[in-house]
Amino acid sequence: MKIPTSLPLWSVVSPIVAWLLLAGSALGMGEVVGGFYTLLLVAGLFAGVLAAVFHAEVVAHRVGEPYGTLVLAVAVTAIEVALIVSLMLAGGAETTGLARDTVFAAVMIILNGMVGLCLLAGGSRHGEQTFGQYGVSASLATLAAIAILTLVLPNYTTTTPGPAYSSSQLAFIAVVSLVLYGTFVLVQTVRHRDYFLPEASVSDEEVHAAPPPTRLAWFSAAWLLACLGGVVLLAKMLAPTLEAAVVGAGAPKALVGIIIATVVLLPEGIAAYQAARANRLQTSLNLALGSALASIGLTIPAVAIVSLATGWTLSLGIDIKSTVLLLLSIIVATLSLGTGRTTVMQGTVHLVIFAVYLFTTIVP
């Protein structure tokens, strides 16, 4: 979309309304108003998501690629990490598998749902789309390494029984995750920034339009954080209602984590979808794969610190079914994104894997 020199009123008001709804809920308005207040919370949630996407576009257009996509990925992940850590500290040892479930859901949603939808949307509108193969290959290699080391390898170590690392192993893997993600960010933003830039031939008014003023970009950055914070907290507040609905429908509780992860990732997902529709697939893939890398590369070290500080055993290893789906997703992503050209075929394959993931979660 074209970035204006001033912000529309709805993008400024939406996060304020979201935080007012949160304050009202804390003061007991939900008990007074009843079910209607839940509908207001849902409306506030989606308004916050749309506002976050808009402000992210403003910031991204100001700082340019690939910094703009990195801003949104790190901002969402930082708030996601804070939410997971706070839930772990509040829930105690019973929540030691929360980080694993959240990270795995995020990786599967991004690698199959988000990427698949972007490839399908872009391919259906523009036919064949192209992107920089070197940047995407670097993203996939880093993601595969971190995902296998953190979610699969714990099942096969022998120092500690169960799907967990020992204290020394956990500390080592946390450092390894930070090294891999830090190196990726260095390559993306400094050493080989050109690998992640959109093709110069792309003709889009948003790419060539003048960037917004610095003051407007700083305001949007602050409002972006406010939007993301409101989205995460509203999702957390709606979780009990959502869980009751899922249980009432006879579905497994694991579906709740998938739905919450989807809501938290909506700002990045919508931004990536819009970029793919505008024939900027490089930007779309930067958003999607960068989000997955930030999610797993920053969350695991953070929860490892909590685990080491509290003495809780952190469950990281996923089960056999999840391992098969994760490996399938990585292999398919490597093949479908390995040529630098995509069509609706690749998008359909990713979405089918995502559908299988959802179905086997509901019907294990």
Question: Where are these predicted regions, by residue range?
Answer:
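Hydrophobic alpha-helical segments, chiefly the membrane-spanning helices
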Residues: M1-P364
